[in-house]
Regions:
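Transmembrane beta-strand segments of Gram-negative outer membrane beta-barrel proteins
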Residues: 38-77, 85-96
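Short loop/turn motifs that connect adjacent beta-strands in outer-membrane beta-barrel proteins
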Residues: 39-43, 83-93, 118-122, 164-174, ...
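Transmembrane beta-strands of outer-membrane beta-barrel pores
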Residues: 49-57, 85, 98-104, 119-121, ...
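Extracellular loop and loop/strand-boundary signature of outer-membrane beta-barrel proteins
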Residues: 64-67, 97-101, 142-147, 192-197, ...
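Residues that define the transmembrane beta-barrel architecture of outer-membrane proteins
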Residues: 69-77, 107-111, 150-160, 201-207, ...
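Residues on the lipid-exposed face of transmembrane beta-strands in outer-membrane beta-barrel proteins
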Residues: 77-85, 113-119, 126, 157-163, ...
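Internal, well-ordered domain-core segments that constitute the primary functional module
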Residues: 132-238
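Long, internal scaffold/assembly segments composed of regular secondary structure
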Residues: 222-224, 232-288
Length: 288
């Protein structure tokens, strides 16, 4: 996928970290009246460490750790609380994970903080959430071509048909659309500084559609789908394209519906896409 950035001089709407935090906090507060006192939340605590004798941590040890591991010797302790409840056609889920680590780029980490509300077949969730690529087994892979689990979750707001629904007895559908905001501006400023160019306050967009063919109660299932992720907007610190790279509502729309500006023109953002195929054979007599 060819991709470059283009600058705009129009009035912009900046979604900074403070505003994002307010949106997520409000979303979490909206859940409080809906959560009863009849079900207790689940809590956990875990400890992890990675020690090596070479120059860097092996890739397979860093992968799928959602940013809690690092190339240096590292250790962390993480605790969290989660809540799930179903009320008639409503499903409510929320989770908060906090960690203290050494050997990485941060000491105090908000690893996960999200709320998920679903009504029948439609759903919305917002916050930092650990995600993996659809149909990818994290125990057998170090990540997908577009999205891996090697970095910390970024704040997102996602809406769509988050679980498969039946269109016909043999065809199911799942659709997702989300927007997010990268929060690594301070990290880039510390590590890149005044030497190299970088982009801060970058936006993120994801959309995907998946179909499942077959009866879930029988042996064979076939899944097919496509996903597209886009980094767009933000502000370049220096270089030939320094300044505003597009942060208005129009740029959010352009990320959702990419357009071709003609030969010689740049696309708005960095587009990456991947197709997914999965064939499943289910045998209830074999325990996996």
């Amino acid at each position: 996928y060819a991709s470059h950035y283009r600058s705009y001089d129009k009035k912009t709407i900046i979604f900074n970290t403070l505003k994002i935090s307010k949106i997520i906090s409000l979303f979490l507060l909206l859940l409080i009246p809906m959560i009863g006192n009849t079900q207790k939340p689940n809590t956990f605590i875990e400890y992890g460490t990675t020690v090596h004798v070479g120059e860097n941590t092996p890739l397979w040890q860093v992968s799928n750790q959602h940013g809690l591991s690092s190339l240096n010797n590292n250790t962390y302790i993480k605790g969290g609380i989660s809540y799930k409840k179903k009320v008639h056609s409503w499903k409510i889920e929320s989770e908060l994970n906090l960690a203290i680590a050494t050997g990485g780029s941060s000491t105090f980490i908000i690893q996960q903080a999200y709320a998920d509300i679903r009504y029948k077949w439609i759903g919305i969730w917002g916050g930092n959430r650990e995600l993996i690529t659809e149909y990818l087994n994290p125990l057998l892979s170090s990540g997908g071509l577009v999205w891996s689990s090697n970095a910390r979750p970024i704040p997102q707001i996602c809406v769509g048909i988050l679980d498969y629904i039946h269109l016909t007895p043999g065809i199911q559908l799942k659709v997702k659309v989300s927007y997010g905001w990268f929060t690594d501006g301070k990290y880039q400023e510390r590590n890149v500084g005044e030497v190299y160019s970088y982009v801060k306050k970058t936006k993120f967009h994801h959309k995907s559609i998946y179909f499942r063919f077959g009866n879930p109660e029988r042996h064979w299932l076939f899944d097919a789908g496509i996903r597209m992720d886009d980094q767009f907007g933000g502000y370049a610190t220096r270089g030939p394209r320094s300044g505003n790279l597009g942060n208005s509502w129009k740029d959010y729309l352009n990320a959702f519906i990419p357009r071709n500006s003609g030969e010689g023109e740049y696309f708005d953002g960095n587009y990456l896409g991947s197709e997914h195929l999965k064939l499943t054979y289910q045998n209830k007599n074999i325990l996996c």
